[in-house]
């Protein structure tokens, strides 16, 4: 004697899709929460001159730049190109048009040591960022 079980899993699949969509929507605000922490720390870590200054590159002299120019050029932006349904990416950097010398400060030159402010901020805030992302993700999924 056999037994036959018939099950319609359409409703179950629909619920799973809804849950996956909900989880996907939570990634962007969670990622932004972490990006904000790094962004604020980068602004604090960014070196600032005491007076207006020129910046000497290999092929050009840039400036004059006012104190805080590099700090004020730091931004964060959501990256549509590097984000997907369940992955949200933010870029934190400096505006190279406003502060073309940013890379020379962040990475150094053959004559000047690096004064990292972006990479240093990522390292310094790593555990705080992870906790903030996790908390915001849970908050978003649970409906605040």
List each language-model region with its residue ranges.
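Amphipathic alpha-helical, heptad-repeat/coiled-coil segments used for oligomerization
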Residues: 1-23, 136, 140, 144
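Short, low-complexity, charged/polar segments at coil/turn and helix-coil boundaries
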Residues: 14-111, 131, 144
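Conserved pre-catalytic core of RNA-dependent polymerases
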Residues: 113-118
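C-terminal or internal capping secondary-structure element at the end of a domain, subdomain, or sheet
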Residues: 121-144
């Amino acid at each position: 004697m056999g037994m036959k079980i018939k099950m319609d899993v359409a409703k179950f699949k629909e619920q799973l899709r809804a849950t996956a969509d909900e989880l996907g929507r939570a990634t962007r605000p969670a990622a932004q929460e972490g990006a904000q922490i790094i962004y604020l720390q980068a602004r604090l870590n960014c070196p600032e001159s005491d007076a207006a200054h020129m910046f000497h590159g290999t092929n050009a002299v840039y400036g004059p730049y006012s104190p805080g120019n590099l700090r004020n050029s730091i931004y964060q932006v959501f990256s549509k190109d590097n984000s997907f349904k369940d992955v949200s990416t933010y870029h934190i950097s400096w505006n190279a048009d406003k502060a073309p010398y940013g890379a020379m400060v962040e990475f150094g030159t053959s004559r000047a040591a690096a004064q990292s402010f972006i990479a240093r901020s990522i390292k310094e805030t790593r555990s705080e960022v992870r906790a903030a992302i996790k908390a915001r993700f849970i908050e978003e999924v649970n409906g605040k």
